[in-house]
UniProtKB/Swiss-Prot annotation:
Zeins are major seed storage proteins. InterPro entries: Seed_Storage_Prolamin (IPR051529), Zein (IPR002530). Residues 1-16 form the signal peptide. Belongs to the zein family. It comes from the Eukaryota. Pfam families: Zein. GO terms for molecular function: nutrient reservoir activity. The keyword Signal applies. This is 22 kDa alpha-zein 8b. Keywords: Seed storage protein, Signal, Storage protein. It comes from Zea mays. The gene is AZS22-8b.
Length: 261
């Protein structure tokens, strides 16, 4: 009997199978992902594991979709705010386009210019230099040698390196001085009118400038127009921006009426 009992135990031990412990672990998680009917009924462990895998995969896939939806909503909100701001500025921009198309185009190019964004001072200096380009191009067509000489002086002059617009304005004034001298000899009144933009007295006090002009052009006080032109040039010299920028060069310019003395 003892041998038969041992034999029966041996046979039952060889036919028995071990259930892995990992298959019992998801048993507490399965019901929250499965419908109540399937969780209550009998279902194979493999089917339950498959359903659990599908439910977990669906929950993982839903998270990026929600994030993308939130990002798209935020993007739409930003676009809406930008559109509203643009609509607020459209009337003023359209008025600027009608009044001054050049300023409108300059304003449009300002935002897209990397130099304007990086260095505002350099951009403004570049814009000032562009104002003198037509005069320089005319000088290059009329007198190429003078244009090349001016370009060489532009690179070697400390004033040109420090303040290029002032240097170019000074060079242009030097070219205008002979023509103004001839104009002063021929017509002193027109000479004073040509000096009007460069006279600081005119900008600060127009009445004093007109009084000075009437005194200079009075035939009882100055009977000779050549002497009148000379006095005009000497009295306007302290107020001229040209003499303030370079007094030595201003004194070197031809003196009107010098032949009479």
């Amino acid at each position: 009997l003892a041998l038969l009992a041992l034999l029966a135990l041996f046979v039952s031990a060889t036919n028995a199978f071990i259930i892995p412990q990992c298959s019992l672990a998801p048993s507490a998680i399965i019901p929250q992902f499965l419908p109540p009917v399937t969780s209550m009924g009998f279902e194979h462990l493999a089917v339950q594991a498959y359903r659990l895998q599908q439910a977990l995969a669906a929950s993982v896939l839903q998270q990026p979709i929600n994030q993308l939806q939130q990002q798209s909503l935020a993007h739409l909100t930003i676009q809406t705010i930008a559109t509203q701001q643009q609509q607020q500025f459209l009337p003023s921009v359209s008025q600027l386009d009608v009044v001054n198309p050049v300023a409108y185009l300059q304003q449009q190019l300002l935002a897209s210019n990397p130099l304007a964004l990086a260095n505002v001072a350099a951009y403004q200096q570049q814009q000032q230099l562009q104002q003198f380009l037509p005069a320089l191009s005319q000088l290059a067509m009329v007198n190429p040698a003078a244009y090349l000489q001016q370009q060489q002086l532009l690179s070697s002059s400390p004033l040109a390196v420090g303040n290029a617009p002032t240097y170019l304005q000074q060079q242009l004034l030097q070219q205008i001085v002979p023509a103004l001298t001839q104009l002063a000899v021929a017509n002193p009144a027109a000479y004073l009118q040509q000096l009007l933009p460069f006279n600081q007295l005119t900008v600060s006090n127009s009445a004093a400038y007109l009084q000075q002009r009437q005194q200079l052009l009075n035939p009882l006080e100055v009977p000779n127009p050549l002497v009148a032109g000379f006095l005009q040039q000497q009295q306007l010299l302290p107020y001229s921006q040209f003499s303030l920028m370079n007094p030595a060069l201003s004194w070197q310019q031809p003196i009107v009426g010098g032949a009479i003395f």
